[in-house]
Amino acid sequence: MRLAQPLLRRKLHKRAQAEPLYGQFIEERFGHYTQSARQDWIWIHAVSLGEARTAAILLEGLRRAMPGMRLLLTNGTATGREEGCKLLQDGDVQVWQPWDSPDVLDRFFLAFKPKMGLLLETEVWPLLVQRAQVHGVPTMLVNARMSGKSMQQAQRWPALMRPAYAGLSAVFAQTQDDASRLKTLGAKVQGIFGNLKFDAKPDAVQLALGQSWRHQLTAPLVMLASSREGEESSWLEAW
């Protein structure tokens, strides 16, 4: 894995030509940080834009339940990092997702010593879960989802994926179907809690704009938002 690091660096520099943020803080991806080691971080991994927005909803409850909590936020994409930056308060830290390599992950856990890890939706990385166990960091999958296709892909690599899902301390599923598939992979599903995204509260400006558009419509309008692969065709068949 260490031999592949130059290739990853080259890929990041190339991607930074279109999205400059990919070229910043590259060393964080390899477990090298400027922050000093502290303990008791609540670590949330929100890989991209959608997960970062879900993390905002989750954080509202966490900060109420744990006043003064210190957030360690990791992201994998530039859009995720940009959105995640909006969630930071004084004392919080944001770094890139560490590469799924034993030495990199060990440096990450030794640097921050998180109290727990909350992974959002589908972000289960075998080595990440395994090294978290080694370092005594309980990890949980929140707002968890698992499509039939993703389950089939995971089942092709049982030696890797089953220990990863079984190694999670707890899993909180969105739907009954998600829960059943996750249990099939060995996950400790604690229950069905719906989709956190439905708890989002639009601000007053958005609500007013929506009402304005609605009053201007002269014909019925149907909108599909945040659809998954295959859902558009199913909707068209139903109509």
Regions found by a protein language model. Give the residues of each.
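Generic structural signal for well-ordered alpha-helices
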Residues: 59, 236-239
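Membrane-interacting alpha-helical segments
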Residues: 1-11
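Charged active-site motifs of nucleotide-sugar-dependent glycosyltransferases
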Residues: 37-43, 215-222, 232-234
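Active-site and donor-binding regions of nucleotide-sugar-utilizing enzymes
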Residues: 9-32, 36-207, 227-229
